[in-house]
Curated annotation (Swiss-Prot):
Keyword annotations: ATP synthesis, ATP-binding, Cell inner membrane, Cell membrane, CF(1), Hydrogen ion transport, Ion transport, Membrane, Nucleotide-binding, Translocase, Transport
Cross-referenced PANTHER family: ATP SYNTHASE, ATP SYNTHASE SUBUNIT BETA, MITOCHONDRIAL
GO CC aspect terms: plasma membrane; proton-transporting ATP synthase complex
Gene behind this protein: atpD
Primary enzyme class: translocase
Entry binding sites for ATP: G152, G153, A154, G155, V156, G157, K158, T159
Topological type in the membrane: Peripheral membrane protein
UniProt-listed PROSITE patterns: ATPASE_ALPHA_BETA
Superkingdom field: Bacteria
Protein name stated in the entry: ATP synthase subunit beta
SUPFAM superfamilies in the cross-refs: C-terminal domain of alpha and beta subunits of F1 ATP synthase (SSF47917), N-terminal domain of alpha and beta subunits of F1 ATP synthase (SSF50615), P-loop containing nucleoside triphosphate hydrolases (SSF52540)
MF (Gene Ontology): ATP binding; ATP hydrolysis activity; proton-transporting ATP synthase activity, rotational mechanism
Subunit structure: F-type ATPases have 2 components, CF(1) - the catalytic core - and CF(0) - the membrane proton channel. CF(1) has five subunits: alpha(3), beta(3), gamma(1), delta(1), epsilon(1). CF(0) has three main subunits: a(1), b(2) and c(9-12). The alpha and beta chains form an alternating ring which encloses part of the gamma chain. CF(1) is attached to CF(0) by a central stalk formed by the gamma and epsilon chains, while a peripheral stalk is formed by the delta and b chains.
Length: 465
């Protein structure tokens, strides 16, 4: 099972074997020294070149590797720790702890390359995954075991929404979450860890990081590492798990780098020829089974804001819902800055939600759309030139806009107001009341940063006083 390194080209390493040929995706271990420090490097077999030579992708920096070093085939793919012991810890792509905490003996390891659940084991029920976030549950609800795309520029609140979802899943559904940091900034990973620690959600989440400074192999496979941990919670413990991927674009980007290094002919815009099949293979593993579910929230970076770029376009094909964050909403001080007209969900269907929820959601969107259409007139002529009916629409739209804001548990530190979880029934009842004109007499300010409608009424009383 021992071989010898015959060529090193950055993250691509060729290994020669005598009487053994490792399978594709098998892990190979190399020990070497750099300036007196010992290093262990894991390689993953990507191609067979003939004559018992394999081409592999390095899962860590390959500086210091030399030809002639001994490499040992491990006889199996990369396997990572799974089970409740992984909660509250940070792992790298090969399942090593990187949080400088105390070591643990993990009793269970699973391979990161797994088949999706067989067709007959998958669940076909369409159920809503209640998040407790008003704007999401009302207008673009998440499917249990579905995939959600989270779109937004820098600094509009993607990470805060992710943390709030982790919090709500932990405290309301007593479920676990897995966070895979795929090719993002190390600083963000560090901040997320400390923010989670401060907001007491760390012991309900496993973190897997393969950051921007790492070679493409690590950035690509880290998504599989996180998914494997989530699959264990679903299949062996029967839980509904939340899986966060930040950022799914980097998964495709690192795949393109690996493909070029392996000498494959690129396809459109320089991406790998296997872009769609790699993405499909990954996304098919994220699903509901009869035992449990994995609901995934995937942050999507859109290169140069071009939605037709092959990487984001391939992701769209798999999404059940999109949550779009808008800077202009954040600038108004309305958080979460979710765009109620741009966010979509296949769950927004009377067959799934029931007539009442569907009617209220569509009513809210209609009022907000009308307000958007009237904004030019208001800017030029002012409110006084509008008809009485339009004035009422604008008044209700502004209340709805403010009522879509909500204080978050994980943001209590900055906002000073206690977080609120709003159940679906309270959520629908509140917006239904606004649409029916029950609260036309209340001031706009009463609806800002409150949970359910009772809190808005209480706030209105306070404002009167």
């Amino acid at each position: 099972m021992k071989g010898v390194i015959s060529q090193v080209m950055g993250p691509v390493v060729d290994v020669d074997f005598n009487d053994y040929l490792p399978k594709i995706n098998e892990a190979i271990e190399v020990f070497f020294e750099v300036e007196g420090k010992k290093h262990k490097l894991i390689l993953e077999v990507a191609a067979h070149l003939g004559d018992n030579r394999v081409r592999t992708i390095a899962m860590d920096m390959s500086e210091g590797l030399t030809r002639g070093l001994e490499a040992k085939a491990l006889g199996a793919p990369i396997s990572v720790p799974v089970g409740e012991k992984v909660l509250g810890r940070i792992f790298n792509v090969v399942g090593d702890l990187i949080d400088e905490g105390e070591g643990i003996n993990f009793d269970k390891h699973w391979s990161i390359h797994r088949d999706p659940p067989p067709f007959e084991e998958q669940s076909t029920k369409s159920e809503i995954f209640e998040t407790g976030i008003k704007v999401v549950d009302l207008l673009a609800p998440y499917a249990k075991g579905g995939k959600v795309g989270l779109f937004g520029g820098a600094g509009v609140g993607k990470t805060v929404i992710i943390m709030e979802l982790i919090h709500n899943v932990a405290f309301k559904h007593s479920g676990y979450s897995v966070f895979a940091g795929v090719g993002e900034r190390t600083r963000e990973g560090n901040d997320l860890y400390h923010e989670m620690k401060e907001s007491n959600v760390l012991d309900k989440v496993a973190l897997c990081y393969g950051q921007m400074n790492e070679p493409p192999g690590a950035r690509n496979r880290i998504a599989l590492t996180g998914l494997t941990m989530a699959e264990y919670f679903r299949d062996e413990m029967g839980l509904d798990v939340l899986m966060f991927i930040d950022n799914i674009f980097r998964f495709s980007q690192s795949g393109a780098e690996m493909s070029a290094l392996l000498g494959r002919i690129p396809s459109a815009v320089g991406y790998q020829p296997t872009l769609a099949s790699e993405m499909g293979k990954f996304q098919e593993r994220i699903t509901s089974t009869k035992k449990g579910s994995i609901t995934s929230v995937q942050a999507v970076y859109v290169p140069a804001d071009d939605l037709t770029d092959p990487a984001p376009a391939t992701v769209f094909a798999h999404l059940d819902a999109t949550t779009v964050l808008n800077r202009s909403i954040a600038e108004k001080g309305i958080y979460p800055a979710v765009d109620p007209l741009d966010s979509t969900s296949r769950m927004l269907d009377p067959q799934i939600l029931g007539a009442d929820h569907y009617k209220v959601a569509r009513g809210v969107q209609a009022v907000l759309q009308k307000y958007k259409d009237l904004q030019d007139i208001i800017a030029i002529l002012g409110m006084d030139e509008l008809s009485e009916e339009d004035k009422l629409t604008v008044d209700r739209a502004r209340k709805i806009e403010r009522f879509l804001s909500q204080p978050f548990f994980v943001a209590e530190v900055f906002t000073g107001s206690p977080g609120k979880y709003v159940s679906l029934d309270e959520n629908i009842a509140g917006f239904k009341g606004i649409l029916e004109g029950k609260y036309d007499h209340l001031p706009e300010a009463a609806f800002y940063m409150v949970g359910n409608i009772d809190e808005a009424l209480a706030k209105a009383e306070k404002l009167k006083a």
